[in-house]
Amino acid sequence: GFGSLFKFLGKKVLK
């Protein structure tokens, strides 16, 4: 799902 991708990207961006 798209949500999964966003969560993965968000985690990378947050760090």
Curated annotation (Swiss-Prot):
Keywords: Secreted, Toxin. It is found in: Secreted. Expressed by the venom gland. GO terms for biological process: defense response to bacterium. One of its GO terms (molecular function) is toxin activity. Pfam families: Cu (PF17563). GO terms for cellular component: extracellular region. Belongs to the cationic peptide 04 (cupiennin) family. 03 subfamily. This is Short cationic peptide-1d.
